[in-house]
Amino acid sequence: MTSISNVSKGSIIRFKGEPHIIESLIHRTPGNLRAFYQANMKNLKTGRNVEFRFSASESVDVIVTERKPYQYLYKDGTDFVMMDSGTFDQINVPEITLGTSSRFLKDGITVVIVFSDDGSILDVEMPTFVEVEVTETSPTTKDDRATSGTKPAIVETGAEVGVPMFIQTGSIIRVDTRTGEYIERVKK
């Protein structure tokens, strides 16, 4: 157990018996009241966001974790098969662990898997940005390229992304895996 004041963003704690990652932690001292920490956390089992107020003197159970890089190989049913780059061991990661960012997984991409002290998978950290090829989008006319609207595009992983009108089939784009938003076109 450690004091809440020693915990920072990105720490994984055991809260109400389940692992939670701290997404933000703010120390507050309002007027005549006692100080507290306002924490926004994400439950790593269910994916739900939780807000909680910890008193400044409260202790929490920090989970000892290990982060290891793994390479994505293929999808097997509802699991993703990942390979340890050093030992070549393969593990299956349930789709629910990756969440919505799994729609941008493509062969050979490197992810970081977070293991708890008992060896179970707590989280999978995707790269923030991935480069994917647009496989299908509606053709544009000269008038469309002059406007600043967006259109739907299907990328090589099967995900749909809103892209600017000038993007055509075969273009390579950079996408934010956290939000699924188009960032920029990549020069070939």
From Swiss-Prot:
GO terms for biological process: peptide biosynthetic process. Coiled coil: none annotated. The keyword Membrane does not apply. GO terms for cellular component: cytoplasm. SUPFAM superfamilies: Nucleic acid-binding proteins, Translation proteins SH3-like domain. One of its GO terms (molecular function) is translation elongation factor activity. InterPro entries: Elong-fact-P_C, NA-bd_OB-fold, Rib_uL2_dom2, Transl_elong_fac_P/YeiP, Transl_elong_KOW-like, Transl_elong_P/YeiP_cen, Transl_elong_P/YeiP_CS, Transl_elongation_fac_P. It is found in: Cytoplasm. Keywords: Cytoplasm, Elongation factor, Protein biosynthesis. Pathway: Protein biosynthesis; polypeptide chain elongation. CDD domains: S1_EF-P_repeat_1 (cd04470), S1_EF-P_repeat_2 (cd05794). The keyword Acetylation does not apply. Gene3D superfamilies: 2.30.30.30, Nucleic acid-binding proteins. It comes from the Bacteria. Belongs to the elongation factor P family. PANTHER family: ELONGATION FACTOR P, ELONGATION FACTOR P (EF-P) FAMILY PROTEIN. Involved in peptide bond synthesis. Stimulates efficient translation and peptide-bond synthesis on native or reconstituted 70S ribosomes in vitro. Probably functions indirectly by altering the affinity of the ribosome for aminoacyl-tRNA, thus increasing their reactivity as acceptors for peptidyl transferase. This is Elongation factor P. It comes from Chlorobium phaeobacteroides (strain DSM 266 / SMG 266 / 2430). The gene is efp.
